[in-house]
């Protein structure tokens, strides 16, 4: 798509989204566009600090859990002593960026609104880790906490997965992995998916949307994919292109959230339409005027707060 033919996204977004886009952090250095991945990760962590201020306080513990790839960091948020379920949160960042700190406020709000224990899993980033390592680490963490639930004072009889962007793909892929390989980590009561990518190679929204403002041009998306996958054949794996998995049976209830001006929006629409066509429990909600990654900005955006609350309420309704 010739850039001039794309939608003028920054003219169309909501007033509160424009406020976020125009918010300057004076102490923040320029984005290291030509820097190393390590430098970009450092910048991303620094930039997200501002947006994580003011999150709900609650008991929080950090643990390392064993996997076949080595230990993986986790962070547990306890909103109350007797939680009805446990939610595993997988952060976004194109598989190459992000950590438990960049998504701390999101996890705290989700724990507060759901009153469920939330466990963030700091899966190994790409390109150091290639598909399907992140999924296998997530599954290993789930199994570990299922076996040690009493020691960590968590309720693993009912669990869920949640994630944003690349984390949404990992959330659903992990749930399908447990189903397909018949791994018992507790009943998967629901999956919460905010503006994920699920396997489309091209779409209307991928053509009309995406730019320097969201880091989701076609070139960006290709770069994330090449960093994450081990080889070309992985593009068709049912745990990367989730539309190649069996979505006609035993899919946990899915809350699917879309951002209006997100190039990945058609992934969410197709996922919803596929699940609904096969009578799999699901709900789709579009958040008008928003860009990809808007969930981070609940400090300024009521819509971001609403989207987290909607997901939390969907999950608790499944319990």
From Swiss-Prot:
Keywords: Cytoplasm, Hydrolase, Serine esterase. GO terms for cellular component: cytoplasm. SUPFAM superfamilies: alpha/beta-Hydrolases. PROSITE patterns: LIPASE_GDXG_HIS, LIPASE_GDXG_SER. Its EC number is 3.1.1.-. InterPro entries: AB_hydrolase_3 (IPR013094), AB_hydrolase_fold (IPR029058), Acetyl_esterase (IPR023508), GDXG_lipolytic_enzyme (IPR050300), Lipase_GDXG_HIS_AS (IPR002168), Lipase_GDXG_put_SER_AS (IPR033140). Pfam families: Abhydrolase_3 (PF07859). A motif (Involved in the stabilization of the negatively charged intermediate by the formation of the oxyanion hole) lies at residues 91-93. The active site is at 165, 262, 292. It comes from the Bacteria. GO terms for molecular function: carboxylic ester hydrolase activity. It is found in: Cytoplasm. Belongs to the 'GDXG' lipolytic enzyme family. Displays esterase activity towards short chain fatty esters (acyl chain length of up to 8 carbons). Able to hydrolyze triacetylglycerol (triacetin) and tributyrylglycerol (tributyrin), but not trioleylglycerol (triolein) or cholesterol oleate. Negatively regulates MalT activity by antagonizing maltotriose binding. Inhibits MelA galactosidase activity. Homodimer. Interacts with MalT and MelA. This is Acetyl esterase.
């Amino acid at each position: 798509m010739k850039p001039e033919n794309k939608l003028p996204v920054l003219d169309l977004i909501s007033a509160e989204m424009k406020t976020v886009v125009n918010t300057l952090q004076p102490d923040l250095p320029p984005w290291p566009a030509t820097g190393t991945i390590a430098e970009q990760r450092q910048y991303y962590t620094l930039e997200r600090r501002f947006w994580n201020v003011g999150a709900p306080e609650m008991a929080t513990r950090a643990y390392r859990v064993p996997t076949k790839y080595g230990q993986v960091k986790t962070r547990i948020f306890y909103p109350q002593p007797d939680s009805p379920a446990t939610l595993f949160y997988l952060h976004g960042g194109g598989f190459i960026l992000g950590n438990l700190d960049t998504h701390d406020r999101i996890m705290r709000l989700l724990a507060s609104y759901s009153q469920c224990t939330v466990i963030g899993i700091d899966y190994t980033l790409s390109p150091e880790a290639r598909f399907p390592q992140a999924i296998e680490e997530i599954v290993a963490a789930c199994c570990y906490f299922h076996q040690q639930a009493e020691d960590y004072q968590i309720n693993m009889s009912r669990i869920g997965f949640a994630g944003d962007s690349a984390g949404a793909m990992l959330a659903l892929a992990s749930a399908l992995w447990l189903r397909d390989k018949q791994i018992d980590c507790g009943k998967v009561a629901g999956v919460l998916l905010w503006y994920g990518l699920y396997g489309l190679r091209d779409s209307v929204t991928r053509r009309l949307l995406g730019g320097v403002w969201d880091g989701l041009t076609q070139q960006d998306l290709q770069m994330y994919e090449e960093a994450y996958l081990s080889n070309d054949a992985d593009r068709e794996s049912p745990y990367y292109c989730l539309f190649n998995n069996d979505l006609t049976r035993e899919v946990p209830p899915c809350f699917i959230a879309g951002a209006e001006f997100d190039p990945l929006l058609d992934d969410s629409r197709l996922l919803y339409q596929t699940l609904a066509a096969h009578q799999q429990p699901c709900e789709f909600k579009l958040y008008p005027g928003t860009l990809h990654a808007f969930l981070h900005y609940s400090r300024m955006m009521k819509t971001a707060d609403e989207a987290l609350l909607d997901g939390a309420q969907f999950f608790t309704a499944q319990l």
